[in-house]
Amino acid sequence: SWFFEFLTDELKLDPKKLYVTVFSGDNENKIPKDEESINIWKKLFEKKGIDAKLVDLVTVEIGSKLGMQRGRIFSYGAKHNWWSRAGPPENMPPGELGGPDSEVFYEFTNVKHDAKYGKKCHPNCGCGRFLEIGNSVFMEYKKSSDKFEKLKQRNVDFGGGLERIAAAMVDSPDVFRNDVFQSLFEDIRIRHGLNYDDAIENEKRAMRI
C-alpha cells in the first residue's frame, strides 16, 4: 500500500493509468491464488474511486486472446507472478524459499497495441503499452521434498525501477526521455549535430549506450 500511495499521492500519477498483476495459483503444487493481495488492491483502488475488477488470465497466450475486459487486477501464473532463485515452483529444490509477487504497471495510452504480440493487449503484453514500474515479492513458502510449507516468518521484498517510474511521470514509454539524460543528449547534439528526437532507431541506440 505504501508504494501505491507513493505513486498516486506523492508523485501524482493518475491511478486510472495503473494496473496490477497477482499470482493466479498453482493447482499442481497446491499453492492457492493470492487472494490477500487481490483484496488489498481492491481497497486501494476503491479509495481512488476506481472499481478494480479482477480478470484471470493465467498465461500471456490467454491474455492476447481475451484482452483487458475492463479489468484493473490481473492474475497470471508462476511464469510472471512467482519468484525464487530457481524460478517457478517446479524448478525449486528442497529447502528453497520463494513466493508469489504482485507487479504494478503503468499504461501509456498514446502507444497503440502492436498485433504481432497477440490479437489483444494486456499488462504482460510485449507491445510497450504497459510498463512494469515496481513489484513486491512475498517470501512465504519453503519447498520441502514433496510439498510447499508456509514460513513462520515471512517478509515482503520490494523492487522498483527508478528510470521506469521517471518515464511514467513524464508519460513517455522511452525511459531515456526523462530529465536525467537530457543534458547528455544536449552535449551529443552540440558535439555531433545529432538530435535524439530526430534520430533513427540505430542512432538512438548508439546515443543511449
Regions found by a protein language model. Name each.
Residues 1-209:
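Structured aminoacyl-transfer and RNA-binding surfaces used for tRNA recognition/handling
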